[in-house]
Structures are given as structure tokens and as C-alpha cells.
């Protein structure tokens, strides 16, 4: 089910902030494999959707489909199960019991040489 307009705006802004913390670019290319969040880039200042993971800086995925990509790209889950099932996922943003949750995987942050701003440190596990 697609997100409601106000929820979409909030999720877009959060994903925008997370993405810019992970990737220090003004325009971040995103490959989206999550039907619920397909319009996320419409309300973002930095995210631009691309049609192939080989063009992307980051992939947003719900984990329902396997993604074959020739390029090394960051994987960010849009639900908890996808985060747990994908060892490549650097983090996740999802709602649980009506509350937003953010998680980052410490070992993958290190592997990609990513240091998050202090405001995100409490979400690292």
C-alpha cells in the first residue's frame, strides 16, 4: 500500500537525511526496490531515482526481490526483516508499532569507511 502524502513527506525527509549522512554528495542516485516507497525521491532535496542499480549510490529495498548489481553499492533496508535477512544492508528505516526506527550495522559502516554524524551514533548496533 502506498504511503499517505504527509507520511511520504516525512519518510522522504528522513531518508534524505540518512542518505546524506552515508554519502557525502549533493545529488544521491537511488535505486528503489520497494513499491511502498517508490515516490520517496519526489519530496527529497538530494535523492534522485535511477532505473538501474549499476547507476546508483544506494539501494532502498524491502527485501522481497533479489537485486543483482555489478557495481558495489550501499544497500539500505526499508523494513526490519529485510535488514536482518541481508548481511549487505548498511542500515534500515522502518515503522514498528507506529513508531519510526533507524538501525545501522556497525561492521558494514566500517567496511565502507563511513563515519556517521553524532546524531546517528545511538542507532548503530
Give, region by region, the residue ranges found by the protein language model.
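Short hydrophobic alpha-helices and adjacent helix-cap/hinge residues
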Residues: 1-125
Amino acid at each position: 500500500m502506498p504511503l499517505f502524502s504527509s507520511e511520504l513527506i516525512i519518510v522522504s525527509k528522513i531518508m534524505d537525511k540518512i542518505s546524506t549522512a552515508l554519502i557525502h554528495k549533493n545529488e544521491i542516485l537511488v535505486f528503489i526496490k520497494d513499491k511502498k516507497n517508490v515516490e520517496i525521491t519526489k519530496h527529497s532535496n538530494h535523492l534522485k531515482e535511477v532505473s538501474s542499480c549499476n547507476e546508483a549510490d544506494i539501494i532502498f529495498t524491502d527485501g522481497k526481490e533479489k537485486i543483482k548489481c555489478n557495481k558495489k553499492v550501499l544497500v539500505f533496508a526499508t523494513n526490519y526483516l529485510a535488514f536482518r535477512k541481508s548481511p549487505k544492508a548498511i542500515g534500515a528505516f522502518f515503522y514498528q508499532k507506529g513508531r519510526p526506527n533507524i538501525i545501522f550495522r556497525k561492521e558494514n559502516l566500517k567496511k565502507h569507511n563511513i563515519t556517521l554524524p553524532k546524531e546517528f551514533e545511538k542507532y548503530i548496533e
